[in-house]
Design a protein with these regions (language model features):
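Hydrophobic transmembrane alpha-helices
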Residues: 63, 77, 85-210
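Membrane-helix exit/interface motif
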Residues: 4, 38-47, 66-81, 113-116
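Membrane-helix and juxtamembrane interface regions of eukaryotic multi-pass membrane proteins
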Residues: 1-64, 210
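Helix-coil boundary and interhelical linker segments in multi-pass alpha-helical membrane proteins
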Residues: 3-28, 68-98, 161-171
Length: 210
């Protein structure tokens, strides 16, 4: 009986816990994303006069705390069936490579989007001259109203691919997709209502589709 329980536990470790490589990569990418967002907030973005709801602000903190907790909870180092670090290896799988490439694409384009949005409120010298909303052009704005939200979804899809064996992370992905899609749709409808000359070919979330 005990041996069966142990075997089941080892199967759980194999199928439902991410490898040490996957966890290190995911935490590194989370760190890169956090530092870039911090830089954008303080040195790139030009915010409007609107204020964020305190509840939304708290949810943002809880999201990052919860996401990191899920990554660590699904790491092999939290399994007591073997000594921590005994089986540590660093070898990239196909899904991890795909995830890294997708993350890089989304990460770079999300930053480009932030720059485009900030420049809408600056003059040629870089001075802020307005906080009004304008129609953005260039980059992924050719296809989407809020490409930074689509990039956010792609970033979490990339992390899900990297942490594929961590079954808990799929719930983080579903949470991100649901709230980002909702926000993207609301933004898109607002732009269509606000600007009569808004480009009709732009979509909310997925180019050419929706």
């Amino acid at each position: 009986m005990i041996s069966r329980i142990f075997k089941c536990k080892r199967l759980f470790v194999f199928f439902f816990l991410a490898s040490s490589t996957a966890v290190i990569i995911a935490l590194t990418l989370f760190t890169l994303q956090s530092f870039r967002r911090f830089y954008e907030t303080w040195f790139v973005s030009v915010f409007s006069e609107g204020k964020i709801n305190a509840t939304h602000y708290l949810v943002g903190f809880l999201h990052y705390w919860g996401s990191i907790t899920v990554v660590l909870a699904g790491a092999t180092g939290f399994d007591r069936s073997r000594p921590v670090g005994k089986d540590f290896t660093f070898s990239l799988s196909f899904l991890e490579i795909v995830g890294i490439v997708l993350f890089a694409y989304a990460w770079i384009n999300q930053y480009k989007t932030a720059i485009i949005l900030a420049n809408l409120r600056k003059d040629s010298s870089g001075n802020v001259v307005t906080v009004q909303h304008k129609i953005a052009h260039g980059g992924l704005f050719k296809y989407l109203s809020s490409p930074h939200l689509t990039c956010e979804i792609l970033i979490y899809i990339s992390l899900w691919l990297i942490l594929f064996n961590n079954y808990m992370f799929q719930y983080v992905l579903l949470w991100v997709v649901s709230n980002q899609v909702e926000t993207a749709l609301l933004n898109h409808w607002w732009y269509l209502k606000r600007f009569k000359n808004y480009p009709k070919e732009r979509k909310a979330v997925l180019p050419f589709v929706i």
